[in-house]
Amino acid sequence: MIEDQALFGYARYGKVDDVVYPSVIASGNGINYGDSDIEILGDRIPRQILYPAKIKQEILETDKLVIIPNGAELVRKPKDLVRIIMDIHSRYGFSKLIMISGISDPYSIPALVYLGISFFDSSILEMEGKMGYRFTPFGIEKADHDVSSENAIFISDMMHIIQRSISDGTLRELIEKAVISSKAAEMVRIADYSYYQDFESVFPVRTPYIKANTIEDLYRPDLIRYRNYISESYVKPDADIALILPCSAKKPYSRSKSHQKVIGALGNLRRFIHEVIVTSPIGIVPRDLEETYPARFYDIPVIGLWYEDEKIMMKRMMSSYMGRNRYRKVIAFIPEDLDFITEAIPYPHEVIEFKSSNLQRLREVIQREIAGGKAVNQKVAKYNSILRYQFGEWILPLVSGYTIRRNYNQDMIVKDGKILFVYNENLGKFTINKASADMFIKNGKFLVEIDDFKPTSNVYAMGVVDATEDIRQEDEVVLVHSGEVRGVGIAKMPARAMIELKKGIAVKVR
């Protein structure tokens, strides 16, 4: 039986028949070669079907696997290969593991695992080693002797790293660091550009961090998800003056030296303005969302220069944002390298160069503009924004009139004497309390329907009956049975995986 220990999007780490995946399986370890057939994880397949001279069918199916034959040929056609893989996901979901045969390029394996491949056969990789092609971290080098045993160690080490990256949520960073194979890079780009909706539906709502070292990070599913939210759904607080600021290396931005200078110079005037930070690869970060994912959890090389793709992204996002969120006045306190962003501001604005000597001028301009303006409770505005961002617009009317109580160094959202949510400052998110669970049940949001049992530390996939489509891995969820609240916790799988799998942790119960 398939037993997933961890998921990252379509990538899976676990065991089937005591064979760990993802892995490269060799003779005697999950795969056995006969004269006329091959046994893979207990299922027999004719050799001529697995290694055809000419591809007559795109996939083969066994009890546990969907097999893509002749991978060596398909890797040279990344668009076709990605299409086949995505068709398999659409048809089989998480019910079967995917194997690809005949891969000769070990450097394509991390990307293929990201796309959802769990097994590779070692036949052609072994042949490469026997011919003296040595695999190294920097590419292939030619030796004058058999290096297949060295290559086996290299591949084993690589697979352990991939397995660990799935488990700790850093697989996307790994595949971006391991860009040796141009075909692998092409496959990831195709997945990002052409299959965003598919990957977004299974991509975690948060990862431990984002190392945004390449332009490819612009197209990560989680970052596109965030940018779409800001462009299409975000609602600003009531302040009608916007202050545009640059990002900082330290996160959240408000703790950086540069932003602390601005905060100190403006003092109480900040209650009358809305601060908006411009950055890449995230685009726009309202101050009220700076503690959330991804804004607090990314790192980018700061060199004072922007790629053209980054400029286009930021300008489009600013234009869309400003089109939906109207301000009476926009003040841009930015360095020269961000001047291009003002082209996307559709109404009156004033630009002040971002430097310490201009802080007094900035204060004077804001003092002049806020005359008669309305002060905003910044903490309430922040928590309203985070609640809306995390759960959706529907939640705000249900918590309207709440108070904020601080206990055990945590802020709590309280209404009618009941603690509804607890704010986790380190993660920039709210945790659901049982007192608010009925809100989710009545609105059909973030629900995992389970069998009739009382959950303890974990709910396994076998105990899941159904799950709402809005659930992504790492989402806060409510556990329910026949309309009765049974608990709350954190999703460890996307909704579809919870429903289709029989093994593995679906929800970590709090």
Curated annotation (Swiss-Prot):
UniProt cross-references to InterPro entries, sorted A to Z: DUF5591, PUA, PUA-like_sf, PUA_sf, TGT-like_sf, Uracil-DNA_glycosylase-like_sf
Gene source species: Thermoplasma acidophilum (strain ATCC 25905 / DSM 1728 / JCM 9062 / NBRC 15155 / AMRC-C165)
Protein's job: Functions in the biosynthesis of archaeosine, a modified nucleoside present in the dihydrouridine loop (D-loop) of archaeal tRNAs. Catalyzes the addition of L-lysine to the cyano group of 7-cyano-7-deazaguanine (preQ0)-modified tRNAs at position 15, to generate q0kN15-tRNA, a q0N lysine adduct identified as 7-N-[(5S)-5-amino-5-carboxypentyl]formamidino-7-deazaguanosine.
Molecular-function GO terms, alphabetical: lyase activity; RNA binding
UniProt similarity note: Belongs to the archaeosine synthase type 1 family.
Protein name (database record): Archaeosine synthase subunit alpha
UniProt key word Lyase: yes
Domain named PUA: residues: 427-510
Enzymatic reactions: 7-cyano-7-carbaguanosine(15) in tRNA + L-lysine = 7-N-[(5S)-5-amino-5-carboxypentyl]formamidino-7-deazaguanosine(15) in tRNA
Subunit structure: Forms a robust complex with the archaeosine synthase beta subunit RaSEA, likely an alpha(2)beta(2) heterotetrameric structure. Formation of this complex highly increases lysine transfer activity.
GO biological process: tRNA modification
Pathway: tRNA modification; archaeosine-tRNA biosynthesis
Domain of life: Archaea
Gene name in the database record: arcS
E.C. number(s) listed in UniProt: 4.3.3.-
Enzyme class name: lyase
Keywords: Lyase, tRNA processing
Protein's UniProt keywords contain tRNA processing: yes
